[in-house]
């Protein structure tokens, strides 16, 4: 997918909400800077719970919410389905609300203020231009020599994540892979119901619960991990399988 396709599809997600569509498209068109990445209708988790923000700029940790005078952004989606989507931890992020109950001129004034704010943030930060080709490329992180959760690292395939850690796979589909440190496992879980497994992540994203719904198999699984620590690694680097904003599969660090 190139930038043109990405941008058109992102803007197309707002078409069923007239005020959101107006504000979001006006911001993007007036900003006119495609070194800046944006995501529409981004699921986020905050200390007070999960929500849906209308426009997200990941390079700045900035969220724009279109306020129509009602709390329409709360997440109204089945819990199991929500567990599949790519959710951004917005703790510490900045949120700007656009009040569309005001006059047309006042709405446009708010948008202009947002444009100025983004341009200033770009000048005041160690800004890295959005490169749609390199952001999912393992070579990007191999050259850096590290990955950091603050960089929102994700890969399109399991093999790409594995290749960041010394592998040279052309394809790989298993949920676990070796790491140069023999005490560490690369793990690619689905954090939603998947066959007999129902893995979950806590609301604060601090703990992953690995659970088999078959009680006998669950007991064997737990006992094996406790008794054979040479075979079963207790330290894991996790890339969870999620659905990206455009429905694509990603493995998010």
What are these regions (language model features)?
Residues 252-253:
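Compact beta-sheet-dominated globular domain cores
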Residues 129-158:
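Polar/acidic, low-complexity leader/linker segments enriched in S/T/G and N/D
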Residues 1-140:
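Nucleic-acid endo/exonuclease domains
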